[in-house]
């Protein structure tokens, strides 16, 4: 680790060797109390207007009040005067080495270097341009806050602090060991979060070495290093209100600079079917919506497989009138029912991916054209049957009821359809048992993934919010019935 030199020229030479070719590197030589100095920063990351008004103006006003015998003569004396005997808004911790200097500068801060002093004064005059606080498009709600996380870490931390106005909220910031040196934050409530879990997360993130860090989800392989896992015991949110609610339950929230997505851990399976609106409506209606979401999730996984199993292996269980229509539709298509269902499922995923990755102005058009023209043309040409299109459409709509489970639901739907088409009822039962085994085998930090999923007072069917508030809940203790 290269320590700062007492020579201003050596420090500037070291910075010029690293950033001299960069157009945004800014180094301004100044003189304070007849002592040579320099202000170093990155243009457009630090606000020059704030810098001059706060730093130099304050130093100039302080000069006439000094007696001649107290006038500083060396860089160390100037540093002590500015740090301890002036109104300059300097950070408490000075810069002592080159790595720390670069870290502060890349965070949008300005650093004052003085000749004859091995320390640098740091000023928080960030002027970073970023996306404003907006409503997240992926998490809709009818009531409650409309704010969403921004891209800057400090802005996101302030949004959480504004909601949780207690001394129990702790926000630890650190720098990731990656090429980008991205800053991240670990947030938790010290009176609710498990101390062992917090220490484990802190240690894991310190030891993690991602090549790049662009989002909080990049930490998941280090936090839960299982090679094959369909369900991850974590959740994501872009709403400060949701993150604050999770913090009050004793959970840990991880934020990464440059990403509006917050990683929440540990997470339960039943929480994929909750939303903020559940607690703003009556218990009866929110319970109905939760039952609807559970049904939609299992429908999105098993409906194509059950349809293939019944139509191919157990046609006697289908009502005769419906069976005759399915058989008539299948006679007009060249593919067997099993292959036809797989083709439609894959085709719907292609359409979804195209609509998602296309520019927003074209994405809706692509989805509409694919749904109307391609689907109608496929049926008219006899490539696909109407019952298969209907089943696949119901499945595609059902999976969007629980968007946080879209990835595992898509893979499980393909797996269940393959098992039902190749092995019939036996394959369908084995696939269902496999899904159940996958869910029951997951735990995060000692908390089972299915903890309290069905029989909790805030599970599939919940009590009214007044009754829930009588028993404060944290993730580390199961709320009794």
What residues fall within each predicted segment?
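Amphipathic alpha-helical protein-protein interaction surfaces
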Residues: 165, 331, 424-425
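Transmembrane alpha-helical segments that form the functional core of multipass membrane systems
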Residues: 254, 267-415
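Membrane-embedded alpha-helical signal segments
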Residues: 1-302, 316, 320, 440-481
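Hydrophobic alpha-helical transmembrane segments of membrane transport and translocation systems
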Residues: 386-388, 392-481
């Amino acid at each position: 680790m290269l320590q700062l030199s007492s020579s201003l020229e050596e420090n500037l030479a070291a910075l010029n060797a690293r950033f001299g070719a960069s157009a945004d590197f800014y180094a301004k030589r100044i003189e304070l109390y007849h002592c040579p100095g320099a202000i170093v920063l990155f243009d457009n990351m630090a606000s020059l207007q704030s810098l001059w008004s706060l730093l130099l103006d304050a130093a100039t006003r302080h000069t006439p009040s000094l007696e001649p015998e107290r006038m500083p003569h060396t860089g160390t004396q100037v540093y002590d005067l500015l740090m301890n005997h002036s109104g300059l808004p300097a950070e408490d911790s000075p810069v002592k080495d080159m790595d720390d200097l670069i870290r502060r500068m890349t965070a949008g801060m300005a650093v004052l270097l003085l000749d004859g002093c091995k320390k640098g004064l740091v000023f928080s005059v960030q002027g970073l341009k970023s996306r404003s606080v907006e409503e997240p498009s992926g998490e809709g709600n009818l009531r409650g806050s409309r704010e969403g996380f921004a891209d800057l870490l400090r802005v996101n931390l302030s949004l959480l602090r504004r909601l949780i106005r207690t001394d129990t909220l702790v926000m630890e910031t650190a720098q990731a060991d990656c090429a980008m040196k991205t800053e991240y934050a670990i947030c938790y409530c010290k009176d609710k979060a498990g101390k062992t879990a917090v220490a484990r997360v802190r240690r894991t993130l310190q030891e993690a070495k991602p090549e790049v860090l662009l989002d909080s989800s990049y930490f998941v392989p280090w936090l839960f290093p299982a090679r094959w896992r369909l369900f991850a015991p974590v959740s994501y949110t872009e709403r400060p209100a949701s993150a604050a609610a999770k913090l009050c339950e004793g959970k840990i929230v991880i934020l990464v600079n440059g990403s509006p997505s917050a990683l929440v851990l540990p997470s339960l399976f039943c929480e994929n079917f909750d939303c903020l609106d559940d607690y703003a409506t009556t218990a009866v209606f929110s319970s109905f919506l939760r039952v609807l979401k559970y049904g939609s999730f299992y429908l999105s996984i098993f409906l194509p497989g059950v349809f293939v199993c019944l139509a191919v292996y157990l046609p006697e269980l289908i009502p005769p009138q419906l069976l005759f229509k399915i058989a008539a539709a299948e006679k007009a298509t060249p593919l067997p029912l099993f292959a036809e269902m797989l083709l439609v499922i894959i085709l719907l995923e292609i359409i979804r991916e195209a609509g998602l990755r296309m520019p927003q102005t074209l994405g809706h058009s692509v989805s509409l054209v694919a749904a109307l023209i391609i689907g109608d043309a496929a049926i008219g040409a006899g490539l696909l049957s109407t019952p298969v299109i209907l089943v696949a459409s119901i499945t595609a709509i059902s999976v969007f009821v629980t968007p946080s489970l879209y990835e595992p639901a898509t893979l499980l739907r393909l797996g269940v359809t393959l098992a039902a088409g190749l092995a019939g009822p036996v394959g369908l039962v084995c696939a269902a048992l496999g899904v159940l085994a996958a869910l029951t085998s997951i735990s995060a930090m000692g908390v089972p993934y299915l903890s309290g999923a069905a029989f909790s007072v805030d599970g599939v069917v919940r009590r009214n919010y007044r009754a829930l508030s009588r028993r404060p809940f944290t993730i580390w203790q199961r709320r009794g019935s």
